[in-house]
Amino acid sequence: MVRPMLLLSLGLLAGLLPALAACPQNCHCHSDLQHVICDKVGLQKIPKVSEKTKLLNLQRNNFPVLAANSFRAMPNLVSLHLQHCQIREVAAGAFRGLKQLIYLYLSHNDIRVLRAGAFDDLTELTYLYLDHNKVTELPRGLLSPLVNLFILQLNNNKIRELRAGAFQGAKDLRWLYLSENALSSLQPGALDDVENLAKFHVDRNQLSSYPSAALSKLRVVEELKLSHNPLKSIPDNAFQSFGRYLETLWLDNTNLEKFSDGAFLGVTTLKHVHLENNRLNQLPSNFPFDSLETLALTNNPWKCTCQLRGLRRWLEAKASRPDATCASPAKFKGQHIRDTDAFRSCKFPTKRSKKAGRH
């Protein structure tokens, strides 16, 4: 009697196993259930998938709250897609157990609240996309588990302020996108934990002054985008801490009126600068023309006097003809800076030839 009962139990278990490992209803599965695609299939709760699943695409479904342990039974997941899922809240421990996860896509949701602990266990996460949500703040320690984070997209949210410790723990972060938020200030210390940033985009915010203190600990920024902020002026030593690495700088559409004389101190590798659509009439004497390859200048009221002779010389040496014209003096108004006679009487410095040293 024992043997028939044992056989019956084994039979029931065998029947259960395929169901547990089966492809979720209305989804498409590939690579022996390693890739599970449930894009826009009307899901309202996270489906059960095989433990060997590596890619799970749940885009365009409806998960208002990601509760704790929502994905705990998926230990081998590497890539998780949750875009356009009407998510409002991510609870503490929502991704607990996903210790192999590298890609996490949470873009285009309605996320307002990210609880402390939301990203616990995500020690291998490298790419985090939180753009196009309604996040208003980053709680201190939120990113602490993300010790391997490389790219963080937070553009198109509602963040008003960055406080000290906002990026605590994310020491390997290299690309940070904060474009199109509501930032009016970057507090001193806000970026101290991510001193290895190479790309920092904070354009289309409400920064009314250049955040010198917040940027002072950054060491290797190659690309800095500050477009569409009401900055008006750039102070001395603005880029000095990362001046040996800075290659691309966006300051267009900022109502910028002036650079301090020492604004570009320490900047030696700058190649591309965007200054269009501002209120500039001069450039500082130490503007780094020597390394420059492209310079966007249009729609500025340039004052064509000898103070601008460095720009004239740079333009003469370039095959391209940036559309920059004089606004003053009156007799040169509308003339191209490259062609005008406004600089005829200016003395241009000449490069001295090196003399042989004494032996």
Curated annotation (Swiss-Prot):
Domain LRRCT spans what residues? 300-348
Q: Which Pfam families match?
A: LRR_8, LRRNT
**Residues in the signal sequence:** 1-22
Which superkingdom is the protein from? Eukaryota
Q: Which compartment or compartments is the protein found in?
A: Secreted, Extracellular space, Extracellular matrix
- Chloroplast among the record's keywords? no
Q: Which UniProt keywords apply?
A: Disulfide bond, Extracellular matrix, Glycoprotein, Leucine-rich repeat, Repeat, Secreted, Signal
Q: Which cysteines are joined by disulfide bonds?
A: 23-38, 304-346, 306-326
One CC-aspect GO term: extracellular space
Known glycosylation sites: 144
Spell out the SUPFAM superfamilies in the cross-references. L domain-like
Q: In which tissues is it expressed?
A: Present in chondrocytes at all ages.
Q: Where is the LRRNT domain?
A: 23-52
InterPro entries named among the record's database cross-references: Cys-rich_flank_reg_C (IPR000483), Leu-rich_rpt (IPR001611), Leu-rich_rpt_typical-subtyp (IPR003591), LRR_dom_sf (IPR032675), LRR_TM_domain-containing (IPR050541), LRRNT (IPR000372)
- The record's LRR repeats, renumbered to this chain, cover 76-97, 100-121, 124-145, 148-169, 172-193, 196-217, 220-241, 245-266, 269-290
GO BP annotations listed: bone development; negative regulation of bone trabecula formation
How does the annotation summarize its subunit structure?
Mostly monomeric. Interacts with collagen type II.
Its function? Answer: Promotes attachment of chondrocytes, fibroblasts, and osteoblasts. This binding is mediated (at least for chondrocytes and fibroblasts) by the integrin alpha(2)beta(1). May play an important role in the regulation of chondrocyte growth and proliferation.
Q: Which family does it belong to?
A: Belongs to the small leucine-rich proteoglycan (SLRP) family. SLRP class IV subfamily.
The protein's name is: Chondroadherin
Organism of derivation: Homo sapiens
- Gene that specifies this protein: CHAD
